[in-house]
Design a protein with these regions (language model features):
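Catalytic cores of carbohydrate-active enzymes across secretory and cytosolic contexts
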Residues: 1-790
Length: 790
């Protein structure tokens, strides 16, 4: 059974304040400042001591305090106003409701983690935070989206450093009854290695978006089955496979049990990739062949890859796959060897099942998360399309964004509301140009308040008189992976020490982040940072903040003047932490990688010279460290400390304004979700509707014989075949620009040369996904001619 943390039963909230319970259970409060202020006003001390958790706050308020609050007309009025704002947020028409001709009905968004609030610790890092921001922006825009994830009984680990500076992990158990979620009546079962595993479902409400979390810690399951959803990214490869079966296959079954029929299934990375197999199984069970089922599934499938390195992709051995899918392959209408072929590559000789390869083959649309990452992904997966030029590999790119209301601090938000407009999140370029009219003194005062709060936070966490509230403050916070090079500054320690101890122009650094428990090199980096920070002469200006989470991140984004990012290019897929800092007025200093590669304009921050053409890793690191120190010494420090007669750094403030103007319209999650909706979701929904219309004809017969999936006889005249197929191809190009030329990918789709077709160099893959050859090229040519005439 689940270990339960101590949780106090919430006393009866007075009737006059009854909406507080609803407000606490809908995570819309996490980005509604006025609702947060309402909760704080109930008891400021308790709000702080309970970690800004409304449920814990309501549980801790005494009956006497409740009576006093119920008699306070200001509190009652604020509660009713917050309730009205929530109702408006979940019911009022938004951007999507204005798209009256949109074919989109519902998107199912799958992710292994969701970072919505530190009060719901179901995330580890960038992927989860991005997923949380995606849900929030979808709610703000009114996009019809339902999310699916796993409920981890112990979440992700809490971090502490021992006497030697070494990271240690602890996993305090969570009680779902103490979290902002509700039970549901839904329970589904899934066969895993011969055991029928029961899966319960919890519902989290994120504005108007429901998030369903799957839980195997259920009475009646074996201890092994109950432990499947124990920890995020815990356990070995086999444990990961079991989790991904629950997420992908179990997730689809949960949606069906809830009566939901999404048109579009969005898979984030390969973790949920098995959802496509479950959808294929459903269609095969209804009478489709495997190839027909693949076409139907692909029509509504969207796959987003988040890693630029093969090592970041889940791959499972044939033996492990045999153990878990050996008896299930027949339900997909194929043999086990056929099933393995879906996730295999000719250039991977170990025969492992690659989740990203399967994701790409079974999704009709795919994208990276930045323009450079899209290029890297096309190169990394080009082997799946050996006859297609790399530039035409069908993997696009939608650059990530961040949910501005979640991450912008209380000191900066009023400035943006005054200069950009009350609805500044997602505003256009013309609106953002208004930041240039802000009073420099007002801007600098807001920046100083954020920095002072960071200093106060650090001192409360670590003690002592650490940091200087007036010194140039540089932040570095992210997962400690080797390619992110957190210790790059330590490669030239004397130069670093000179920066830290400058009596007139001091610089201070704040580091935070976790290393995966199995990543020893990442742990070593944390140890090296911590040991340097413990040196008496520099420890007051160089610190490591342990137990990094969303609360720590917010304080750092609000308080740092410069955000540092120095990965090895091009290994950073996107890297959204710099976006959050930028919205708070921080200036980025980064390698031109991820989002910064496309957003740096020469004036909105600094670019570290990259030596990615140097094959010697050690020499490359030294060259890039030298470039970084040069920027700090010759540009960043002088600009920050160049003060006018009024004591203000006008050059720095001007750079902040340009930073907002150039980045504000682009780096928000509102822009990102709009792009996903118009460029991926709506075209996929149109394709899914077309496939559904075809499905209705699947069982039809006429006097001549059974019809194929386009509603035509099995051996029709050539023109009778080509015309409907051409029309189908055109309809899948774009829901907005149907008159544009049909790209190569759509020809392949229309001709039955599936996404995997060009990779079909083995006999098995040719049989599963036919395509290629002179006959196919002739058919393609005829189709092209017909489309041009149409």
């Amino acid at each position: 059974m689940r270990a339960v943390r101590e949780f106090n039963v919430v006393p009866a909230v007075p009737a006059a304040l009854a909406p507080l319970s609803e407000l606490a259970f809908n995570l819309h409060w996490t980005w509604d400042r006025e609702t947060q202020q309402l909760f704080e006003s109930l008891d400021p001390g308790l709000w702080k001591s309970t970690g800004r958790d409304p449920l814990r706050l309501l549980a801790a308020i005494s009956a006497a305090r409740w009576a006093a609050l119920a008699g306070n007309p200001d509190i009652v009025s604020a509660t009713n106003a917050a309730s009205e704002r929530l109702r408006d947020a979940v019911e009022a028409p938004r951007w999507f409701q204005g798209r009256r001709d949109s074919p989109l009905g519902l998107v199912a968004y799958f992710s292994p983690e969701f970072g919505i609030s530190e009060t719901l610790p179901q995330y580890s890092g960038g992927l989860g935070i991005l997923a949380g921001d995606h849900l929030k922006a979808a709610s703000d825009l009114g996009v019809p989206l339902t999310a699916v994830g796993l409920l981890y009984a112990e979440g992700y680990f809490r971090q502490r450093l021992n006497a030697d500076g070494v990271q240690e992990e602890r996993y305090p158990p969570l009680d779902p009854l103490g979290l902002a979620m509700h039970t549901t009546d839904v329970q589904v079962t899934l066969e895993i290695a011969g055991e029928q595993v029961r899966i319960n479902v919890w519902k989290v409400q994120v504005g108007r978006v429901p998030l369903y979390l799957l839980d195997t810690n259920v009475e009646g399951n074996s201890p092994e089955a109950a432990a499947i959803t124990n920890r995020l990214y815990g356990g070995d490869t086999e444990h990961r496979l079991r989790q991904e079966m629950v997420l992908g296959i179990g997730g689809v079954r949960v949606l069906r049990a809830l009566g939901l029929q999404p048109q579009v299934f969005h898979t984030n990375e390969g973790h949920a990739g098995f959802l496509s197999l479950e959808r294929i199984r459903e269609l095969v069970a209804s009478g489709f062949t495997f190839r027909e089922a693949v076409e139907s599934v692909r029509a509504g499938g969207v796959f987003t890859t988040h890693t630029p390195v093969p090592a970041g992709i889940d791959r499972f051995s044939p033996e492990l796959m045999k153990k878990y899918f050996g008896t299930l392959a027949a339900s997909y209408g194929v043999t086990f060897d056929d099933l393995m072929a879906i996730g295999s590559r000719d250039d991977e000789k170990d025969g492992k099942f690659n989740m990203a390869v399967m994701g790409l083959r079974l999704a009709g649309r795919a994208n990276g998360v930045a323009q450079l990452h899209g290029e890297v992904s096309r190169e990394m997966f080009a082997g799946l399309w050996p006859n297609v030029p790399q530039a035409e590999v069908p993997i696009g790119a939608i650059t990530n964004g961040v949910h501005a209301p979640t991450w912008v601090g209380d000191h900066i938000a009023p400035l943006l509301a005054k200069s950009v407009g009350p609805v500044w999140d997602g505003a256009d370029e013309a609106s953002w140009s208004g930041v240039g009219k802000l009073d420099p003194a007002e801007v600098w005062a807001a920046r100083a308040k954020g920095r002072a709060e960071l200093v106060t936070f650090v001192r409360a966490r670590l003690g002592d008189a650490l940091l200087d509230p007036k010194a140039l403050t540089i932040g570095f916070a992210r997962r400690f992976a080797t390619y992110k090079r957190a210790t790059l500054l330590l490669s030239q320690p004397e130069r670093l020490r000179k920066l830290l101890l400058d009596p007139d122009r001091p610089v201070q650094f704040v580091f935070a982040g976790k290393a995966h428990p199995a990543d020893q090199p990442g742990k070593d980096m944390i140890r090296d940072i911590e040991l340097f920070a413990r040196q008496l002469d520099v420890g007051h200006r160089f610190i490591f903040l342990p137990d990094y989470d969303m609360a720590v991140a917010r304080v750092m984004y609000h308080g740092c003047d410069v955000w540092l990012n120095n990965p090895r290019r091009p290994l950073e897929a996107c890297g959204t932490s710099g976006m959050k800092a930028a919205l708070n007025g921080a200036l980025n200093c980064s390698i031109l990688d991820g989002w910064w590669d496309e957003c740096f304009d020469g004036e909105n921050g600094w670019a570290i010279n990259s030596a990615d053409d140097d094959p010697d890793t050690g020499r490359r690191d030294q060259r890039e460290a030298t470039s970084l120190f040069g920027l700090l010494e010759r540009e960043i420090m002088p600009l920050y400390y160049d003060r006018g007669n009024d004591g203000l750094p006008h050059g720095w403030i001007g750079k902040m304004a340009h930073n907002w103007k150039s980045l504000g319209p682009f780096i928000t999650a509102a822009r990102m979700v709009r792009d996903y909706t118009t460029d991926l979701y709506e075209p996929a929904a149109a394709g899914s509707r077309l496939a559904a219309a075809d499905d209705k004809q699947h069982q039809r017969r006429d006097p001549v014989g059974r019809l194929n999936r386009t509603g035509l006889r099995q051996r029709p005249r050539a023109r009778a075949v080509a015309r409907p197929v051409a029309q189908r191809a055109r309809s899948r190009c774009s829901s907005r620009h149907l008159d544009r030329p049909v790209p190569r990918r759509q020809f392949e789709l229309a001709l039955g040369n599936r996404l995997v077709g060009p990779d079909a160099r083995t006999r098995r893959r040719r049989r599963l996904f036919p395509g290629g050859g002179n006959a196919d090229r002739r058919r393609r040519y005829r189709l092209h001619a017909l489309i041009r005439r149409a």
